[in-house]
Every structure is written in C-alpha cells, then in structure tokens.
Curated annotation (Swiss-Prot):
The keyword Cytoplasm does not apply. Pfam families: Ribosomal_S15 (PF00312). Part of the 30S ribosomal subunit. Forms a bridge to the 50S subunit in the 70S ribosome, contacting the 23S rRNA. One of the primary rRNA binding proteins, it binds directly to 16S rRNA where it helps nucleate assembly of the platform of the 30S subunit by binding and bridging several RNA helices of the 16S rRNA. This is Small ribosomal subunit protein uS15. GO terms for biological process: translation. SUPFAM superfamilies: S15/NS1 RNA-binding domain. Gene3D superfamilies: 6.10.250.3130, S15/NS1, RNA-binding. GO terms for cellular component: cytosolic small ribosomal subunit. The gene is rpsO.
Length: 88
C-alpha cells in the first residue's frame, strides 16, 4: 500500500493546500497511486484474485470520478490527466 509520506506528497502536489484531501483531483491522484501499486503487485502475484478484484473496483471508482471532473471543470481535468499520464 501507499505509505503516509507518499500520500502526503500526493496531497501537497495535487491539492489546493496542505490539508486538502477531499478535492476530486486529490482523490483521483490517490486512487491512481493505489492502482499503480496493485498493478505491480499483481505482476508478481498472478493468482491473487482478491487483489485483482480490488484493482478493478478502484479502476471503476477512478473512472466515475474522472467523468464527474470532466463535466465539472474541463481545463482542470485536462491538466490532471496530463500530469498523471493517463490516456484520454
């Protein structure tokens, strides 16, 4: 999992201020970090089906947040996906 220091780094990078953990951009960035971690975990542990299910759940959650963010603020959405390196 992502440790506390990595989460704080993501929050400070994508948030409006240091304690901004609830904004959509920060949530998407945190979920992306967890997805990257689980992807690497599943490359090593191919038969870990519960982690695979959790990964698919996170991907769906991120997708819905991205759709919401695209409708809410298109320019910030484009900046976020380019910063995170997501395809869209």
């Amino acid at each position: 999992m992502i440790d506390k220091k990595q989460k704080q780094k993501i929050v400070s990078e994508f948030g409006k201020n240091e304690g901004d953990t609830g904004s959509v951009g920060v949530q998407i960035a945190l979920i992306t970090g967890r997805i990257k971690y689980l992807t690497e975990h599943l490359k090593i542990n191919k038969k870990d089906h519960s982690s695979k299910r959790g990964l698919l759940k996170l991907v769906g959650q991120r997708r819905s947040l991205l759709q919401y963010y695209q409708k809410k603020d298109l320019e910030a959405y484009r900046a976020l996906i380019s910063k995170l390196g997501l395809r869209k």
